[in-house]
Amino acid sequence: MKKTVVASTLAVGLGVTGFAAGNSADASEQGVDKAQLAQQAQSNPESLNEAPVQDGAYNINFNYNNTDYSFQSDGQYWTWSYGQGSTNAPAQETAEQPQQVEQPQQTEQASTEQPAEEAAPQTEETQQPQQEATTQTTSSSNESTSNESSSSEASEGSSVNVNSHLQAIAQRESGGDLKAVNPSSGAAGKYQFLQSTWDSVAPSEYQGVSPTEAPEAVQDAAAVKLYNTAGASQWVTA
């Protein structure tokens, strides 16, 4: 299961902003109850989306019952994730402290590294926050995600080449509706971006406005950019 920052089912996660949380420390070194954190991640993920596990910056990583857990914060943004048998923490999403309410996301971990995909062309270069790079190497996953070199084709009404996997994600998240809005999470647009996620991948002229205000080509390009940099695990249903 993987937490992220964008969607209804969308990885509540289309949202990706990275940070450095300092030196990693085992849970026992910080006086953290591993069993309690593991149970909270498995059975009450909403509470982890609403608030960090403790005040200030922290970087807690541990293995409990053959499952890896990671909880990080730089004092302003916080992330958490878990996955079975992973030697590295899954790609992580961040949430901005008092604002976004995020939903849990299933950890999608393939047995091979995801092939790099060619980024779709963009009319403007936007600055994207630095993101922690992690390699997914686990051989077991909650769902089987196969990023084969699937054929890419432009979405109807858009000149951006969107691979078939990302097209399927858009159908699950919004049915392809550019104006779709999730009333509970605030995720919006064809790919159900949270606002903080959208601002990290959208062109500068569309940052700070709802994804629903952007044309399909802009939404497609932003989703491709997020998919190529952070992977399909940004969507819960991916």
Curated annotation (Swiss-Prot):
Its EC number is 3.2.-.-. Residues 82-161 are annotated as: Disordered. Keywords: Glycosidase, Hydrolase, Secreted, Signal. SUPFAM superfamilies: Lysozyme-like. GO terms for cellular component: extracellular region. It comes from the Bacteria. GO terms for molecular function: hydrolase activity, acting on glycosyl bonds. It is found in: Secreted. Pfam families: Transglycosylas. Residues 1-27 form the signal peptide. InterPro entries: Lysozyme-like_dom_sf, RPF. Belongs to the transglycosylase family. SceD subfamily. Is able to cleave peptidoglycan and affects clumping and separation of bacterial cells. This is Probable transglycosylase SceD 3. It comes from Staphylococcus saprophyticus subsp. saprophyticus (strain ATCC 15305 / DSM 20229 / NCIMB 8711 / NCTC 7292 / S-41).
